[in-house]
């Protein structure tokens, strides 16, 4: 599982080139797919913030502080996990970062193994969040009839019973069921039930 997670993007955003280079080297040694940026705007203008991944942010940078980058990610409903690094950390700053949803907060210099573990935790959470976002988007795209049929499928009712309850043809139920499975990338009723459970 960690190998699949490690293929997800990890972004390092720090204005200090030597720190970017050392973190990039360190994280690549741990098998991560790393891209570095020297400031918040270049990261936000280039990286795909809608996909699963993790961003390691310096809290104090020119142009945009790490907290401002994080606020932007939250406002844009990004799935990226956030880890803060700081050279001048204090307890209130760490508490604020964690309350805003950051995975962790480290003071420089950071131990490689600790950062790698935090990134794996972040990537796992980010992947779950990205999947949930996709499912929520799929749910919003459902017609009212598809929502009714989905609820009845989740209740364990068969096609004929659903058709009888909704006064529609069995073939119509089959078409809607196929559409639901396609929209949620679910091959079985169990997978549909799992997705439905995530949404509720």
Functional labels for PLM-detected ranges:
Residues 38-39, 64-69:
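Acidic catalytic/metal-coordinating carboxylates
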Residues 61:
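Receiver (REC) domain active-site loop signature in two-component systems and cognate sites
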